[in-house]
Amino acid sequence: MKEPIAEAYDFCVLISCYNNRDGLVRSLQSICYDPVKYFVLLIDDGSIEPLIFSDLTNHLSPLLNLHVIRLPRNSGITRALNAGLHYLEGRTDFRFIARLDCGDLCSEDRFHRQVGFLDGHPDIDLVGSWCVFKDFSTGEAYTYTIPTQHKQIMRDMHFKNVFIHPTVMWRAGVAARLPAYPETFPHAEDYGFFYELLQHGKAAILPYYLMVCEISPTGLSLSHRKQQLRSRIKVVRQYRDSLLYGVIGEIRLRLLMLLPSEWALKIKKQLRNI
């Protein structure tokens, strides 16, 4: 890894990978930004075939600053991301942290829009975007749109995590003062993390489709759906700032637990099919 230069980078892309090298390469190749103005921190979460630095760089810009942290065993996304945040502690050579998941694709303007927005809105600490969910094996896709203003975001957080994890970017300085991704909310660690961040700052959603997120039947959100819903209930109970919205949110989540995941996904596709 090249030696860091003070204030050299606009952002760090934080991404973890477990046995998905091809998806990782596709995701990193989709980033359209000056490669000397950002760096990638990759956490290899104990992949059976270790991710080799030289192999990855063969598929990426030679100017890209890529650092790989290899975990000795598969520890799950929460601990993998926290290992990345721990590595970043104390560094002052970048301004923002952006998330990306293996298999997901960035639009050409994603990072230009998010960096520009945060630069132009110093009161905002966390920014996400609309996105498209797509099953690449069938071509089926549906859109995900949500309110864009902080007040509406705070209201809707009682009902769901409005931030799709790989769409977000946040200020590194703010995150450095917060706890890491919580391990007390299995498979909803991002919900807890963003809700905690919202206790200390403001957020916005950009009304543009800046990501295509892969739908996979083996993805964590589907394979651990009930545990995720239980964790989401715990998040709402801990962070709600409205008793009414909190109760409505918990009832909604409990009803979702009764609905098979296949039905829930089918309903989403029918409502938002494109």
What name fits each language-model region?
Residues 1-30:
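N-proximal low-complexity "stem/linker" segments adjacent to membrane-targeting elements
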Residues 23, 48-59, 105, 109:
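Acidic helix N-cap motif at the loop->helix transition within catalytic regions
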Residues 29-39:
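Short, acidic, metal-binding catalytic loop of nucleotide-sugar glycosyltransferases
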Residues 44-54, 73, 101:
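A conserved acidic beta->alpha catalytic loop
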Residues 71-90:
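Glycine-rich, basic loop-to-helix element that forms the pyrophosphate-binding segment
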Residues 109-141:
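Conserved donor NDP-sugar-binding/catalytic core segment of glycosyltransferases
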Residues 147-231:
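Conserved nucleotide-sugar donor-binding catalytic segment
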